[in-house]
């Protein structure tokens, strides 16, 4: 797939003009030496990802405050391929990716997994599949309870989510009627959202299934009403111009020139600014061979480097478990063993069914030309199939206690991908043994996801080199209940495609083979096929002020420090039953208001 991306480079050169025509209010600098002298920054945001740019944008609304954002990756203006919805699956493994790999996973037979994380301005909102899900109300109420932060309750965050959303009721002349519930959406916010869909016969057959098997797969008018159970039209962060809407294109582009953005620059450490607990200074460099520089924020430093890099930066700064830091030669300034622990993610597997349905393939070069000329065609869509299904398993299929946050929360997600002879590029690492393409015909392909993994992983350090990749251990299937739930998800999917609606057009599974039906055989298949769904959170988890666990307090301040907060996916205590993009936006909006209010 990378070779295909290389072939597209010549087409993307013509699209580079798109970036040069966009005027940021913020001022972007390509190198630390380019930063203006004599500017004192009130706030420094270490990491220009989804959350970091929300925080920078909101703080800059006070025109008296100067804000600096430091981002390791390039500007999204310099990566025009990230703006095209139809290229989303091509981005992992490219220049906008950290290209992490996990350590071998014991329960997966020693397989290591690719762990894609965005390395570009806008972070994962510039690099992800653009799916817009808020998660169940149960998750938000659970987070509020375990963190002792009532501001996170569903009834309190729903207005935030609606206020930040700019939902479009039509897209490329497609009406949204019957695809969403307008009452649960906002229409005047920063982040553009649509419910775009392709007109394929598969859609109608899915809807027939919701009538035939309504108990397991009811039709859900809107997956973002707080009770996502059933089959619904997918919503995406795409704007009316058929381009990706990210924190870079929505929030950052609305700021004034009191925001400075330094790209292609690596944050190496957080540094004490004068006493043992005041961490308002940040150390950074272009690469390992470049000189390091230090800047100090007048008010606060906000760490927003993501679920992997944020704990890595804290540990390199001396904030972490004492024994672990001493072992790699880092002086311990704040002893907190919770740093880097509690990595909560979702396990998924690809399923393929032999089918006679029309395929969803298209000519990529022609589609790029169409998008370039008219912002229409296949590249205007984030996916070739446009439904999500959320399944709640019955109690007798849970192998013990219910891991979900409540009765309105699903355990399983189906994300439909494509109908094709080609295999999908993004979520199938090289370590997974897929069928030989020559041995299969046209196949329906989709992901089955265990939304509530009990197993927790970690991010630790190999050494004290801030430019070295950290050790990522997902501990996938460390708890047997996780593989049991995913196994039931596979069986649920087979029931869906054994329905009368699909009887004559969808046939036996080819991955896993049709004969793989017993618990033992399905588990063996999952151990060789499961991958991360790349929704990791929790490595710097929020917890109550008085808690003996966790890394940040409900006000996002790092425990035991002053002048330092963390705002990104790492503070979310547990992965939601959904995609993480919108919870990250919402946490960032909440944090921004707290920070601003503390100085007004």
Swiss-Prot record:
What's in the keyword line of the UniProt record?
A: Carbohydrate metabolism, FAD, Flavoprotein, Glycoprotein, Oxidoreductase, Secreted, Signal
Which residues are annotated with the PTM Tele-8alpha-FAD histidine? 127
Looking at the Swiss-Prot or TrEMBL record, what is one Pfam family this protein matches?
GMC_oxred_N
Q: What is its cofactor?
A: FAD
Q: Which reaction does it catalyse?
A: pyranose + acceptor = pyranos-2-ulose + reduced acceptor; pyranose + acceptor = pyranos-3-ulose + reduced acceptor; pyranose + acceptor = pyranos-2,3-diulose + reduced acceptor; a pyranoside + acceptor = a pyranosid-3-ulose + reduced acceptor
Q: What is its EC number?
A: 1.1.99.29
GO MF entry, a single one: flavin adenine dinucleotide binding
Keyword Signal in annotation: yes
Keyword Glycoprotein attached: yes
Which InterPro entries does the record cross-reference, listed alphabetically? Answer: FAD/NAD-bd_sf, GMC_OxRdtase, GMC_OxRdtase_N, GMC_OxRtase_C
* Residues carrying a glycan: 99, 114, 199, 275, 342
| Segment forming the signal sequence | 1-25
What is its biological role? Catalyzes the single-oxidation or sequential double oxidation reaction of carbohydrates primarily at carbon-2 and/or carbon-3 with the concomitant reduction of the flavin. Accepts only a narrow range of electron acceptors such as substituted benzoquinones and complexed metal ions and reacts extremely slowly with O(2) as acceptor.
- Name the protein family: Belongs to the GMC oxidoreductase family.
Q: Which PANTHER family match?
A: GLUCOSE-METHANOL-CHOLINE GMC OXIDOREDUCTASE, GLUCOSE-METHANOL-CHOLINE OXIDOREDUCTASE N-TERMINAL DOMAIN-CONTAINING PROTEIN
Q: What is this protein called?
A: Pyranose dehydrogenase 2
């Amino acid at each position: 797939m990378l070779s295909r991306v290389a072939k597209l480079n010549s087409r993307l050169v013509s699209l580079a003009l798109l970036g040069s025509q966009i005027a940021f209010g913020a001022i972007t600098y390509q190198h630390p030496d380019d930063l203006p002298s004599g500017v004192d920054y009130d706030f420094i945001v270490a990491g220009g990802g989804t959350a970091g740019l929300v925080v920078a944008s909101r703080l800059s609304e006070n025109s008296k405050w100067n804000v600096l954002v430091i981002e390791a990756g390039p500007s999204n203006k310099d990566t025009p391929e990230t703006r095209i919805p139809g290229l989303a699956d091509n981005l992992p493994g490219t220049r906008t990716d950290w290209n992490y790999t996990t350590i071998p996973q014991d329960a997966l037979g020693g397989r290591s997994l690719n762990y894609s994380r965005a390395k570009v301005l806008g972070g994962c909102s510039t690099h992800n599949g653009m799916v817009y899900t808020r998660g169940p109300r149960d998750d938000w109420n659970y987070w509020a309870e375990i963190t002792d932060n009532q501001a996170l309750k569903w009834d309190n965050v729903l207005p935030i989510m609606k206020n930040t959303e700019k939902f479009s009721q039509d897209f490329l002349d497609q009406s949204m009627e019957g695809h969403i519930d307008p009452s649960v959406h906002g229409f005047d916010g920063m982040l553009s959202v649509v419910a775009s869909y392709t007109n394929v016969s598969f859609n109608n057959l899915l809807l027939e299934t919701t009538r035939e098997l309504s108990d397991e797969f009811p039709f859900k008018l809107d997956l973002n009403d707080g009770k996502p159970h059933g089959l619904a039209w997918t919503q995406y962060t795409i704007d009316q111009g058929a381009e990706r809407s990210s924190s870079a294109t929505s929030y950052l582009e609305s700021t004034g020139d009191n925001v400075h953005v330094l790209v292609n620059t690596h944050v190496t450490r957080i540094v004490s600014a004068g006493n043992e607990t005041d961490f308002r200074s940040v150390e950074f460099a272009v690469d390992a061979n470049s000189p390091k520089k230090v800047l100090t924020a007048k008010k606060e430093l906000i760490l927003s480097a993501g679920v992997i890099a944020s704990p890595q930066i804290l540990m390199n700064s001396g904030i972490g478990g004492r024994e672990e830091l001493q072992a790699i030669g880092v002086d311990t300034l704040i002893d907190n063993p919770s740093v880097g622990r509690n990595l909560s993610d979702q396990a998924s597997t690809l399923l393929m069914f032999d089918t006679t349905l029309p395929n969803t393939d298209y000519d990529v070069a022609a589609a790029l030309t169409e998008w370039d000329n008219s912002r229409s065609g296949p590249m205007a869509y984030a996916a070739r199939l446009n439904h999500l299904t959320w399944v709640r398993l019955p109690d007798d299929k849970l192998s013990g206690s219910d891991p979900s946050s409540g009765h309105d929360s699903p355990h399983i997600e189906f994300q439909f991908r494509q109908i094709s002879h080609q295999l999908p590029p993004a979520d199938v690492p090289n370590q997974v043994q897929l069928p030989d393409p020559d041995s299969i015909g046209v196949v329906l392909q989709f992901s089955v996801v265990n939304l509530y993994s009990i197993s927790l992983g970690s991010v630790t350090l190999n050494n004290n080199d801030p430019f070295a990749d950290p050790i990522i251990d997902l501990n996938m299937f460390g708890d047997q209940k996780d593989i049991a739930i995913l196994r039931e998800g596979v069986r649920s999917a087979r029931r869906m495609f054994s329905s009368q609606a699909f009887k004559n057009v969808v046939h036996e599974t080819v991955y896993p083979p049709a004969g793989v039906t017993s618990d033992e055989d399905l588990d063996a298949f999952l151990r060789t096929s499961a991958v991360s769904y790349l929704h990791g959170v929790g490595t710097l988890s929020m917890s109550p002020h008085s808690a003996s666990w966790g890394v940040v307090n409900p006000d996002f301040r790092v425990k035991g420090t002053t002048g330092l907060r963390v705002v990104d996916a790492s503070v979310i205590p547990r992965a939601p039953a959904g995609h993480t993009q919108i919870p990250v936006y919402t946490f960032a909006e909440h944090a921004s208001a707290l920070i601003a209010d503390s100085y007004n």
